[in-house]
Amino acid sequence: MTPVLIAFPLSLTLIEYNQATPALYVHYLYKTSLFTYRSADLDYTFYTEKNQHIPENLIANFKSEQRIAEMYHEELKPIFKVNESYILRIDSLGVYDLKAFNPDYIVLSQSPKINLERMLNQFPNTRIIADGSNYKSDVDRWESTCLKKKIPFHNTYEKGFYKIE
């Protein structure tokens, strides 16, 4: 009976290890943007602003708490896809007028000068995430707009990282 009791939890651990689902993490990092993408193969890609370095303590935490096969570092992109979800990142340029694109998540970075109410009219079924690179006054204004329009809002400054699977 003992071999069965030991083998069952071990097999569940192996199944979980081999079936990691891809995920995108939007981190809170003061005055900058940091995303991490986990592939199904447990490869991690850290996305930062151009010429921005990843804090060593964050890398150490990921290495100790996650099963990491490989780590990469790339510059942030405006559009990400995780499983069937599309993520649009709007930075200080405020460019989002994409007619045939309907993102599931919108990440606001570097305090873009946008009319959030107008943008939410264009993308009514989206979730809004504000990362740590935004001014607090902008984040407060966006949060009240989302609350008024009943759109889910996540502030990484208050609630920590956001995970999209």
Cite the ranges covered by each PLM segment.
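Glycine- and aromatic-enriched alpha-helical transmembrane segments of multi-pass membrane proteins
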Residues: M1-P22, K31
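Extracytosolic and intramembrane catalytic regions of membrane-associated proteins
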Residues: Y30-E165
